[in-house]
A protein has these predicted regions:
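Core SAM-dependent methyltransferase catalytic element
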Residues: 210-240
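Conserved class I S-adenosyl-L-methionine
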Residues: 76-85
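Conserved SAM-binding loop of SAM-dependent methyltransferases across substrates and taxa
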Residues: 86-98
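Conserved beta-strand signature within the Rossmann-like core of class I S-adenosyl-L-methionine
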Residues: 179-186
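A short glycine-rich, Lys/Arg-flanked "PGG" loop and its adjoining helix->strand segment in the class I
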Residues: 166-178
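Class I SAM-dependent methyltransferase Rossmann-like catalytic core
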Residues: 40-74
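S-adenosyl-L-methionine
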Residues: 113-144
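Conserved SAM/SAH-binding beta-strand->alpha-helix loop
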Residues: 109
Length: 240
């Protein structure tokens, strides 16, 4: 998982529909993830190439992964991960009991995407922009079985513009159940998304756990729809 600074702000044109590269129906014939360079070194090389896009020197730790998993809704079965990075959160999700076939992992960095694709051959691994999540999840077929229970994010929201934050959050909640959760971590002392912006787009936030032993330490925040928005989403879903 890209640590909190894993910026997913697309520079240049918005990706065309044909730009999204998906693992299905073509998949690697074998798992060659472990035969490549060490994961931490792969991550560090990507940081050297683009420190603004990957604003952390190392992947997230296991303690942070546990804190993120702890915020999943009870009996969550289908999850979307934004910024899969080296797969720290992906492994934790599968270890928690989320079936790989019920997991959509989105990664913008090409090298990290290739690592994820080789490592998690049964998951829906896609190279694309988080702002296009609804189109990506629809094209991949992930939403054919219904909306997700939660989105786990390793994106560097704190480094993004207010507009980009809004676009990502709106895209994420368009793929979630009415009571779905958007789970985010950050190295900052407060929510990476301002309460003013959350009020504008109808979301609420609460602070979750704190990973003291992560490098650097990180806080977890959980975003949900406001009650009125959730009721509207339920009615809209029932009509569909």
């Amino acid at each position: 998982m890209l640590a909190a600074g894993a910026l997913r702000h697309y520079h240049g044109r918005r990706p065309a529909f044909s730009d999204f590269r998906m693992t299905q129906p073509t998949r690697p014939e074998k798992n060659n993830f472990d035969s490549g360079p060490p994961v931490a070194w792969t991550f560090f090389r990507q940081w050297l190439k683009n420190p603004l896009a990957i604003a952390a020197l190392s992947p997230s730790g296991r303690q942070l992964a546990r804190q993120m998993i702890a915020e999943l809704p009870h009996e969550a079965q289908r999850v979307i991960e934004l910024g899969g990075g080296t797969g720290v959160f992906t492994r934790a999700l599968i270890g928690h009991g989320i079936a790989a076939k019920d997991l959509l992992v989105l990664e913008l960095n090409e090298a990290l995407y290739q690592h994820l694709r080789a490592r998690f051959v049964d998951a829906h691994v896609v190279c694309g922009d988080a702002r296009e999540l609804k189109a990506i999840a629809t094209a991949d077929g992930f939403l054919d079985q219904g909306p997700a229970d939660a989105v786990i994010s390793g994106l560097g929201l704190l480094s993004m513009t207010k507009r980009t934050q809004a676009e990502i959050l709106q895209a994420a909640f368009s793929t979630l159940k009415p009571e779905g959760r958007f789970i985010q971590f950050t190295y900052g002392p407060k929510s990476p998304v301002s309460r003013e912006l959350l009020a504008e787009i109808g979301l609420s936030v609460r602070r979750g756990g704190f990973a003291w032993w992560n490098m650097p330490p990180a806080s977890v925040y959980v975003y949900t729809r406001n009650r009125s928005r959730a009721v509207h989403a339920v009615r809209t879903e029932s009509k569909g």
